[in-house]
């Protein structure tokens, strides 16, 4: 459960991402594909090379979903309901992949905002991404 301090940290950190959200999403996806090659199996139709338009496009979708989750941090199940349905019923993404992408997002944010990535912010973002993952996998049951 996100505390008021966690919510504040997440909103502040995501606010600093600003117009770079799509780029960070794409970078996190690239990190995931390189670090965890089995994740590529969900994207057989994508050009997964560095800077690919498809990876950038999906990175923007990831970032937009996270921006939506930040904006609706008190009601993520409703805000992410359609996305949860998509991943559970159509795409059938293995839930472990959300943890892998979350880790890569944390690394990406830390690399771009080292001064702002304090232990408290890191912990809050980790809890937030875990909450997003929980919501996205809630309809798998």
UniProtKB/Swiss-Prot annotation:
Molecular-function annotations in GO: haptoglobin binding; heme binding; iron ion binding; organic acid binding; oxygen binding; oxygen carrier activity; peroxidase activity
Phosphotyrosine modifications at: 24
Signal peptide, first to last residue: none
GO biological process: hydrogen peroxide catabolic process
Phosphoserine: residues bearing it: 3, 35, 49, 102, 124, 131, 138
Cell division listed as a keyword: no
Residues involved in O2 binding: 58
Globin domain mapped to chain residues: 1-141
Modified residues (N6-succinyllysine): 7, 11, 16, 40
Protein residues bound to heme b: 87
Tissue-by-tissue expression: Red blood cells.
Annotated positions of the Phosphothreonine modification: 108, 134, 137
Gene3D superfamilies: Globins
Listed GO CC annotations: blood microparticle; haptoglobin-hemoglobin complex; hemoglobin complex
Subunit structure: Heterotetramer of two alpha chains and two beta chains.
Family listed: Belongs to the globin family.
Name under which the protein is recorded: Hemoglobin subunit alpha
């Amino acid at each position: 459960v996100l505390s008021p301090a966690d919510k504040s940290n997440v909103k502040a950190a995501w606010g600093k991402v600003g117009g770079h959200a799509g780029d960070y999403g794409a970078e996190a996806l690239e990190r995931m594909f390189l670090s965890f090659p089995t994740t590529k199996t969900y994207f057989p139709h994508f050009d997964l090379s560095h800077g690919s338009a498809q990876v950038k496009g999906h990175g923007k979708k990831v970032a937009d979903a996270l921006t939506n989750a930040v904006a609706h941090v008190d009601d993520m199940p409703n805000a992410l309901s359609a996305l949860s349905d998509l991943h559970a019923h159509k795409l059938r993404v293995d839930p472990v992949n959300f943890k892998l992408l979350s880790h890569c997002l944390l690394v990406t944010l830390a690399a771009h905002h080292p001064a702002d990535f304090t232990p408290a912010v890191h912990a809050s973002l980790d809890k937030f991404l875990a909450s997003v993952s929980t919501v996205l996998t809630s309809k798998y049951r």
